[in-house]
C-alpha cells in the first residue's frame, strides 16, 4: 500500500519478520508498505479490505503514530515462491544454455544488483559464481534447501 505524502521521517527500511511486514518512505514522503502472502495458494489479483485492515493493524503495532495516515492505493499480485522461500538462480543442466533467475517471492528488488551481476557472470563464463551456488535449481532434488526463510520476512 502507499500512503499520502508526509514530511520525511523514516530514513530506513523497516522489516518485521514477526509481523510479516516491511515499510519505507519515498523521497516524496509516501510510505510504501508491503505485507505477507496469503496462507493458501491461488491466482487472485485483487486487493481486499480484509488484507488492508490486517496490514494496517500490524503497521500500527510498530508505529502507533500512524493511526490517521491516509492510504492512497494498494495492489495485489502473484508471488512466485519456492519451497524454501529462496530464489532459483541457476543454469538448468538438462537444457544447454538455459538459465533461470526467478522465484524471488517476497525478497522483491532488494537483491537485484547482486543477482543481476552474478547471473551475468554465470551466463558469460558458463560457471556458477560461489555467491549464488546455494540457489541452484538442483538443490530441491538434492534436499539442500537454503535455510534463510527469515530473510524473506513476509512468508507465511
Name each region found by the language model:
Residues 18, 60-156:
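C-terminal catalytic lobe of FAD-dependent flavoproteins
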Amino acid at each position: 500500500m502507499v500512503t499520502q505524502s508526509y514530511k520525511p521521517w523514516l530514513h530506513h527500511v523497516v522489516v518485521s519478520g514477526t509481523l510479516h511486514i516491511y515499510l519505507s518512505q519515498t523521497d516524496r514522503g509516501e510510505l510504501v508498505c508491503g505485507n505477507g502472502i496469503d496462507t493458501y495458494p491461488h491466482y487472485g489479483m485483487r486487493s481486499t479490505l480484509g488484507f488492508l485492515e490486517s496490514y494496517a493493524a500490524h503497521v500500527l503495532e510498530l508505529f502507533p503514530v500512524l493511526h490517521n495516515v491516509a492510504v492512497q492505493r494498494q495492489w495485489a499480485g502473484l508471488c512466485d515462491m519456492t519451497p524454501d522461500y529462496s530464489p532459483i538462480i541457476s543454469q538448468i543442466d538438462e537444457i544447454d544454455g538455459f538459465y533461470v533467475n526467478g522465484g524471488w517471492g517476497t525478497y522483491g528488488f532488494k537483491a537485484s544488483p547482486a543477482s543481476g551481476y552474478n547471473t551475468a557472470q554465470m551466463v558469460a563464463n558458463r560457471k556458477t559464481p560461489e555467491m549464488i551456488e546455494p540457489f541452484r535449481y538442483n538443490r530441491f532434488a538434492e534436499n539442500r534447501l537454503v535455510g534463510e526463510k527469515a530473510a524473506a520476512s513476509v512468508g507465511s
